[in-house]
Swiss-Prot record:
Organism: Methanopyrus kandleri (strain AV19 / DSM 6324 / JCM 9639 / NBRC 100938)
UniProt KW keywords: Pyrimidine biosynthesis, Transferase
Gene Ontology MF terms: amino acid binding; aspartate carbamoyltransferase activity
NCBIfam families recorded: asp_carb_tr (TIGR00670), PRK00856.1 (NF002032)
The UniProt record lists the keyword Transferase: yes
GO annotation terms (biological process): 'de novo' pyrimidine nucleobase biosynthetic process; 'de novo' UMP biosynthetic process; amino acid metabolic process
EC number: 2.1.3.2
Record: residues binding carbamoyl phosphate: 57-58, 107, 135, 138, 269-270
Keyword Transferase: yes
Record text on subunit structure and interactions: Heterooligomer of catalytic and regulatory chains.
Classification via PANTHER family: ASPARTATE CARBAMOYLTRANSFERASE, ORNITHINE CARBAMOYLTRANSFERASE, MITOCHONDRIAL
Protein name in the entry: Aspartate carbamoyltransferase catalytic subunit
Binding positions for L-aspartate per the UniProt entry: 86, 168, 229
Family: Belongs to the aspartate/ornithine carbamoyltransferase superfamily. ATCase family.
Length: 309
């Protein structure tokens, strides 16, 4: 029986390296299922997506993954979710929805919402993002993409660029990279540096971490560059956003002049203006491969949780 069977997925911190390796290994098997067009191993199972804050890619990725394994999907999102949030508390919502499904995928603007939902329900809860806190399945697909592109994670020099203060993807990813022994380079304006509690946590697990303000200076040394957008909606102070927006821009010229030919550029998407469109044509650009890998990894995760692998 898989260690993921009937398990909640709330934070990367809930998993050991061995467990993450189990998921990555199963994703390799699931990629072959994906390439065959899927199968029906989760027939009769129902996934509920509850999205109380905006999402396109994550929600569609989970729904696609479930359908490709023969399962069904019910959804609450958009205006309907906003209305529900106003008239019914989260606890009542998840306690109701658990009777309609076998697994819940939840996105909520409040940090800790996914953990609360998991404590209240008997069906597994998967965190699809809770405020600026965690986004574990994005980290899983990021790890899988890096492993596919580079053949390993340990020892790689990986740069995390952009909003490291409010960006939940990098909060999850930095911890996972540390578990695998990657060398982490944090690149951001002073105002958007990684929160001190995360830096302290990385230090406690023996991570090799360096902070930088200048992308051009460190770029030639990187194996992977993970770019994040600066999200207006994450800033409690609009003036702070205005001060830091547009702090970094990855251009074709920058990559061609300063990056290694085997650099891998990743981005959780959507982007704003932090990666110029003509970078897409470069061999280093792998962010659309991430999208494909996201479906595969979520297929693997759902199979391990609901089918036991």
């Amino acid at each position: 029986m898989s260690s993921f069977a009937n398990r909640d997925v709330i934070s990367v911190r809930d998993f050991t390296r061995k467990e993450l390796e189990e998921l990555l290994s199963h994703a390799e098997e699931m990629e072959r299922v994906y390439e065959r067009g899927g199968d029906d191993r989760l027939s009769g199972k129902i996934l509920a997506t509850l999205f109380f804050s905006p999402s396109t890619r994550t929600r569609l990725s989970f729904e696609s993954a479930m359908h490709r394994l023969g399962g069904d999907v019910i959804s609450l999102g958009g205006k309907e979710a906003a209305s529900t949030a106003k008239g019914e508390n989260l606890a009542d919502t998840v306690r109701t929805v658990e009777h309609y499904c076998d697994v819940i995928v939840l996105r909520h603007p409040k940090e800790g919402a996914a953990r609360l939902a998991a404590e209240l329900t008997d069906v597994p809860v998967i965190n699809a993002g809770d405020g600026a806190n965690q986004h574990p399945t994005q980290t899983f697909l990021d790890l899988y993409t890096i492993m596919k592109e580079k053949g390993r994670i340990g020892g790689l020099r990986i740069g995390l660029l952009g909003d490291l203060k409010y960006g939940r993807t990098v909060h999850s990813l930095a911890y996972a990279l540390a578990l695998f022994g990657a060398k982490i380079h944090l690149i951001s304006p002073e105002e958007l540096r990684m929160p001190s509690h995360i830096l302290e946590e990385l230090e406690q697990i023996g991570a090799e971490v360096e902070e930088h303000r200048d992308l051009e200076e460190i770029l030639p040394d990187l194996d992977v560059l993970y770019v994040t957008r600066i999200q207006r909606e994450m800033f409690p102070d609009p003036e702070e956003f205005e001060r830091v927006k547009g702090s970094y821009k990855v251009t074709r010229e920058l990559i061609e002049e300063h990056a290694r030919s085997d650099l891998v550029i990743l981005h959780p998407l959507p982007r704003v203006d932090e990666i110029e469109p003509d970078v897409d044509e470069l061999p280093q650009a792998r962010y659309f491969d991430q999208v494909r890998n996201g479906v595969i990894v979520r297929m693997a995760l759902l199979d391990l949780i609901l089918g036991g692998g």
